[in-house]
Amino acid sequence: MKIKLLCTVLLAMSFANTFAQSSKSTWGKTDYEDAPWVKNVSRPNEITEGLQNRHLSVWSSHGRYYDAKKGGWRWQRPILFGTTEDLYTQTIVLPYLIPMLENAGAIVFTPRERDWQKNEIIVDNDSRTNYKEESMKKKWATTSDKGFAQHYGSYNDGENPFTAGTARQVKARKRNSKISSVVYQPTFLETGRYAVYVSYQTQKKSVEAAEYIVFHKGQETHFRVNQRMGGGTWVYLGTFEFDKGNSINNSVVLTNHSSHRGIVTTDAVRFGGGMGNIVRGGTVSGLPRFLEGARYSAQWAGAPWNVVSKSNGSNDYNDDINCRSLMTNWLAGGSCYLPEKKDGKKVPIELTLAIHSDAGVKTDDSYVGTLGICTTQDGNKTLGDGLSRKVSKTFAEQLVANVKKDLDNAFHINWTTRSVWDRNYSETRLPEVPSAILETLSHQNFPDIKLGQDPNFKFTFARSVYKTVLKYEANMHGKTYTVQPLAPNNFKIEYVSANKVRLQWRPTTDASEPTATPTSYNVYVAMGTRGFDNGMNVRNPYFDIELLPGIVYNFKVTACNRGGESFPTEVLSALRNEGATQTILIVNAFSRLSSPAVVNTSTEQGFDLEADPGLSYGPVAGWAGRQANFNKAMMGKEGPSALGYGGEELVGKVIAGNDFNYVKDHAEALRHAGKYNIVSSNSKAVEYGEVDLSKYAMVDLLLGNEKDDGHSLYYYKTFKPALRQQLTKYLNNRGKLFVSGSYLASDMQGVDEQDWLKNNLKITFDGANYDNYNSVVSGMGMSFDVYRTINEQHYGAYTPDYILPVDNAFSTLTYADGKTAAVAYKGTDNSVFTLSFPFECIKDAPTRNSIMKGIVNFLMKK
């Protein structure tokens, strides 16, 4: 008996040692080195030490789902402080994290709809509407397998659109002549940004470099798609600006030109995220698809029923959690990372990450903070290709530690972390590749969400996560990494000859990342009404370009290195007018990003969206509605009596934020104002003395909604001392200044600041205009509307200033209540026109042109 027991123990020890030796802590020699699923071949910068050829699955938590027990569509988490987790985490993942990963070269799959576009247009070979084939040397034919087909109206649960139609195929051709092609030319109901998804079939002889060309607002971007993987679902190419209507300049073309022999296949092409169309309980959600859970997107993407609904239709809540990982496994099956799963799509996804927020409160105004979650004790003993599950714990630990380090370094806040839980969670148990859940913060604790709704917090948080993914992947493959740079600063444009301008900027240092140094820059150009091109990579921090006359040129710049590309600068503009002898300078001083107005007293907490909804980085779909309950005594409760409870009137609205492209609105209006050249600059370049204002016949200072609000993580002041100094010097030299902004007087409450307004702008502060629902402004021979409220088209002039003229200045525009909205001054010393709302908030372009012409004539004519 003792001998038998000893043998059993020895056998167990031998098995344990064998298992320990066979399970890996890195991918080792396992590495995908063939053509990526999708490659943008128009990218001007080369990435060699980033996330190139890495395929990742990343998602934001929850989403609207159908509750079969209670009978109705509902959120998975409660509405608190104007949002819900179902909405909030998307505002980190979609505008920040995924773009950072893609800028590093990664191919990112996300199981929830990623496009904040409510319209959807599908062009398909089965309907033939807006679909056109051209067969040259090689002829298009129908494949033997089922493909996508769309029918009118909604879809029943379990109905797979990718088995309802057909697909097409053609032999590939190496020669770049007599090329066969398909044109997908949709009719867009609205101008806007649309995600482009293609679909095709993977066959035995499929090519690994199918050529797709996206035509967008007169530009074209080329892609290579590896059709040896990922057939029979939607494949994301990118998001592009398209014009309203039907035009070849806004289309997708697939050709059979390829460097490889084989077959090119094609099916439907989808433009835009669209509205939810899956019926549950007899009804659709009634919301955009991007607000729904992943379960419904998975069905629309052709996933098998056992992936879409593990519960077989009985529990959508569980299905939504499970299908994210199951869809990742389905796509990755058969790749080098999941070689044993033969029935998959062979997409080499090697990492999953779920971004959540959490509940919990602190009564002492401290942070609940960040938590990591992994699963090492449940599920399969090893991950794909024999990888130890413990690698997921390493990933989760690094995510949490780096978030604290980066947030503390950036904002000096002593951010709280809550270690890492190693527990049985579906999103970390089911994936067959390394995985983690990151609970960003507590959406129930106001100190957390107060920071969490600041766009600069979101950027820094997302950048920390991106950097952790980058470093983790480099370690897993034994590679060198380089962190992508930060966006350039002090961007300016100046004339260097009669028809040539120079764009110039400074690199931004990232003190926490020594590798994040730019080695080159991408310069993007848009002429007139055309969209931005694909960029030109330059080595130096400047770029000269000759301008054609009469066309407004728009520019933006990114910083690059071996690790990838930064976010862009703001858009600056320039115009050359034949025969012009004077130049007008537009100065962009509107860089504010902020949460809504903060209420934080001994008895009340929350966001006051009515006073100021804040400014997101571009549009955002993260708000549910205005907060109704501010009572701190109800902290930690749920339902209508809870602190933070509010409405749902903003659900489904993609609310406009700071797009950083308002200089072009001013430039376009100035183009109609007379025969002047136009250049522009960021205000920091002016503050640093890098721009000589005395060279310009007129300065147009764009302040937008800039102000020091007292709660933002960064300091946004309308007239900083350095800017005031430069403007005073300019005005003392008979300068001509046009300045517009919502808070240009209320943000100047110090005695010296008020004196500066009186002496230089000839105005005083006369209170705030709280009547945001009366948008009419009158004067200068017209009445017109101004954006004043939360909307989807343009940020609003929320509670703008009333101003009064002093000395010989006079009122020129009034709000609906008769109080002054604009003051003009013309003296022997200088001329000033002050507008107490942002010029770009005038809704109608012809009205902007007329108002600008009147202002320029007043300032420039003697």
Language-model-detected regions and their locations in the chain:
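A glycine-rich, often tryptophan-bearing local segment used as a flexible ligand/cofactor-contacting loop or short
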Residues: N705-D817, P846-K853
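Active-site-adjacent mobile loop/cap segments within catalytic or ligand-binding domains
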Residues: S251, H257, A268-G276, L351, ...
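Active-site microenvironments of hydrolase-like enzyme catalytic domains
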Residues: L291-R389, W421-Q444
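A short beta-strand element within beta-rich, extracytoplasmic domains
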Residues: S180-K204
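Pro/Thr/Ser/Gly-rich low-complexity, intrinsically disordered linker/stalk tracts
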Residues: Y472-T515, P549, G563-Q582
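Extracellular carbohydrate recognition and processing domains
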Residues: K217-N246
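Aromatic-Pro/Gly-enriched surface loop or interdomain linker
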Residues: F81, I98-A104, R112, G281, ...
